[in-house]
Structure formats: C-alpha cells, structure tokens
C-alpha cells in the first residue's frame, strides 16, 4: 500500500506527463532567419546543430522585403527577391545533401513578406517557434535604428540567439 505522500507525488507526476508547456522540454521548432549574408548562414549552421542535438524541426526563414518605392519606379523587385529566395533554397539543399549521411536534421524553408523584424515575428508565431536564431547585423545603420536581433530580444517572446 502506498503512503499518501507517494500517492500525491504520483498524481502530480501523472499530471505533468499529460501537460505540455511550450519551450520547457527543449526546443521542438527552431526558427533561423536567413538573408544570404555570412552571419545569417553561420546562424543557420548553428541552428542546424542545435536542431540535430535537440531532435527539433529547423525552420529556415527568408523574409522577402517589400520595396514599394522600387516597384513604383518599375524595378522588378518581386522577381529579384524571388531569385534570392530560390538561390538560398538551392544553397541550403546542396549543403544538406552533402551532410545528409553525417547529420539527420529535419528542416523546412519558408518565405515571408515584409520587413525582417515583422517577418520573423510572424514566422515564429505561425510556426510556433520555441527558439529564434539570427545572425548579427552587418549594417552600421542598425546602431541608430536597432538591429533585428535586438528588437527580437526586446520582444521577450522566445529565447533568441545571435550568432556573430
């Protein structure tokens, strides 16, 4: 016969197994923002290693910029940014083919539209991200406006890792 303390502990343990709390058992969905820059590709590589170790889904996200001013002047903006996204997908596929026998990482590629910060927020929300990985900004202008990474950290909604 079990003591009442053991029975209570057993009931608590049973309740904990049935309840899932997002982000408590290690990340299951890791979002990595990529834009083709060296730092974003390092962030993707770091995120892939983390996803492999945690057996998590790696969601590689490219935020396609909306450049209405360029489009208004007749520049083929959508075509150019679409080519960037396609180039990134091809580069990622080539890298994963080379490494598929060494590492087995489940990954998906997603394209969102908008500015990088809002695009990554939308992606992280829609994909139910447990963690967000981004590369450090390589732009001097971000010292004044604020980098995407800093804005994601300030949002306080996910653990954010910034890869140099």
Question: What do the PLM-derived regions correspond to, one by one?
Answer:
Residues 131-155:
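Glycine-rich, Arg-bearing micro-motifs that act as flexible, cationic patches
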Residues 1-25, 97-132, 139:
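Structural beta-alpha unit
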Residues 62, 135-137, 164:
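Short secondary-structure boundary segments
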Residues 19-76:
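Small/aliphatic-rich secondary-structure junction motif
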Residues 61, 108-112, 161:
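General small-molecule cofactor/ligand-binding pocket signal
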Residues 2-23, 62-90:
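Acidic, proline/glycine-rich short linear motifs
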Residues 75-79, 126-128, 150-151:
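Short, hinge-like loop/turn segments at secondary-structure boundaries
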């Amino acid at each position: 016969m079990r003591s009442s303390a053991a029975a209570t502990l057993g009931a608590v343990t049973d309740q904990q197994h049935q309840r899932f709390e997002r982000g408590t058992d290690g990340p299951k969905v890791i979002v990595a923002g990529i834009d083709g820059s060296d730092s974003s590709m390092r962030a993707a590589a770091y995120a892939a290693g983390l996803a492999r170790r945690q057996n998590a889904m790696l969601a590689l996200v490219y935020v396609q910029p909306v450049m209405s001013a360029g489009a208004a002047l007749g520049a083929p903006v959508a075509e150019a940014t679409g080519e960037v996204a396609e180039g990134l997908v091809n580069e990622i596929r080539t890298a994963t083919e080379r490494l598929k026998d060494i590492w087995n990482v489940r990954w998906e590629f997603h394209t969102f539209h908008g500015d990088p910060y809002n695009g990554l927020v939308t992606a992280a929300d829609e994909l139910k991200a447990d963690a967000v990985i981004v590369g450090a900004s390589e732009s001097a202008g971000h010292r004044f406006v604020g980098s995407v990474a800093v804005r994601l950290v300030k949002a306080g909604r996910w653990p954010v890792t910034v890869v140099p």
